[in-house]
């Protein structure tokens, strides 16, 4: 089968266009959250300061903004080294005709923030994003009398505490968020993982990839029968491609059937990549190239 793929040649014209470099100046970039969010830090690390940026309340709003032409790029968290992948982002990538064109990894350094004059013993309630609460689980387990409430964003939690001016409230967010909203750091070492990092993806509505892109993300659906996943993974093995990640999400309304998300090394111009994608397309359902970056 794999010899046949090679004899037939590789996939024909790709639906993606190669570009020398992504535009990183004078572009419109959207991130989810408020000023001081980790997404904003990732945006600045990737694009710099010569951009026009704005923020939205939810992740789907960010993808909607680029789909509607309000922004050129969106910055979204996709995976954390402690809490794992962000499942909702994977689902949203399928609902919108948007594509990954870059990634940025930043270190996450959570702080416990409170109103000026507040003390650790004053705290009764703590607010943050659900991922941040998970990342600080061991610390929070030492304070079981605290009520935990998940909000849409870590910086949004800092903003709430600042607006309420209640010394019994605290937020888990970055030091930058604390400075932005005038909060004080009540405790610093609150994350059990000293190298806690989050990978953010840069998303566009353009099917483009940089000439030196070296990672590809795809997704596909498989029937629930013996050997189906093994057969798909064989395309990576026989084309000598290094798969760096695989995740699965249940298919709505189809018990015990899954959609798989795979990251592997390569460039869409590589013959081995084209052969593998062709083989996967023939065996899997609803295969989509999410991006090459």
Regions found by a protein language model. Give the residues of each.
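Domain-level signature for soluble enzymes in the chorismate/prephenate branch of the shikimate pathway
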Residues: 1-293
